[in-house]
Regions:
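Conserved catalytic-core segment of nucleotide-activated headgroup transferases in glycan assembly
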Residues: 1-39
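Soluble or luminal CAZymes and related metallo-dependent hydrolases
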Residues: 3-11, 53, 143, 147
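Alpha-helical elements of Rossmann-like donor-binding domains used by nucleotide-donor carbohydrate transfer enzymes
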Residues: 10, 14, 115-118, 150, ...
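A generic local structural motif
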Residues: 11-14, 50-53, 70, 95-96
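Donor nucleotide-activated moiety binding/catalytic core segment of transferases
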Residues: 26-73
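Catalytic binding pocket for nucleotide-activated donors in carbohydrate/polymer assembly enzymes
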Residues: 39-41, 70-140
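C-terminal alpha-helical cap of glycosyltransferases
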Residues: 144-158
């Protein structure tokens, strides 16, 4: 294990078994973390922390594993799975309040490496999609870029 205490070899194995694809893991550290000294050791893990455009990285990814980052919502808009890995959850919530909406996020959560590999192994896309759909309906702040069309339709109805 290394960066973020993730067992990258185990993750690669479980992703390859689950999705039947060759896997590369792109690792992007928080901007406040000096990632230049971190050696990921696995040739299938690539440190992309210095890549300037996170949107490009999201477009090239099939799945996201993140923690408390709002990037999870951006990635959800791409209709791709997000998994939350929260090994420091207890200390994190003791140090700072989470957004009220965090507990409502529809993403599978893991607090340990073994849990993370289990939720990936047991992942069912249809159940995940339904949770995301219900979240989108419930969260009135959520927008899929159709606000102008919806507004015009509302005006026409009046």
């Amino acid at each position: 294990m290394n960066a973020y205490n993730l067992d990258y070899s185990k993750l690669i194995h479980v992703f390859q078994n689950k999705f039947r694809k060759n896997v590369k893991i792109l690792v992007r550290f928080h901007p406040n973390v000096d990632s230049s000294f971190i050696n990921l050791q696995d040739t299938d893990c690539i440190n992309v922390s210095t890549y300037s455009n996170p949107q490009d990285l999201m477009m090239s990814a099939d799945v996201m594993i993140t923690d408390y980052s709002s990037a999870s919502i951006d990635f959800m808009l791409l209709n791709r799975p997000v998994f939350l890995y929260l090994p420091d959850y207890q200390s994190y919530v003791n140090d700072r309040p989470l957004d009220d909406n965090f507990d409502k996020l529809p993403f599978p959560r893991a607090y340990h490496n073994n849990e993370l590999t289990e939720i990936i192994r047991d992942f069912e896309r249809s159940k995940y999609d339904e949770k995301v759909r219900l979240y989108e309906l419930e969260d009135v702040r959520f927008d899929r870029g159709k606000a102008s069309v919806q507004c015009a339709n509302w005006i026409e109805e009046k």
